[in-house]
Amino acid sequence: MTIYIVTFQTYETGEFQVSYNVFSKRKDAELEARELRSNGHTKVTVVKREVRF
């Protein structure tokens, strides 16, 4: 199964963080990334991972 997560640096402290949301579609992850960028966060990246259960 493929999942997508969004990583970013906060605009206030510059700390590296991972979004709490996990997405099954890249399109949804890109929407989250766009929102984070519009809120001033930097180095916003969509990361693709393969997981097995």
Regions found by a protein language model. Give the residues of each.
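Short beta-strand/loop motifs in extracellular/secreted proteins, especially
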Residues: 2-4, 42
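Short, mixed-charge low-complexity intrinsically disordered segments
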Residues: 18, 31-53
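A short beta-strand micro-motif
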Residues: 4-10
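Acidic, low-complexity, intrinsically disordered interaction modules
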Residues: 13-14
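Conserved aromatic
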Residues: 23-26
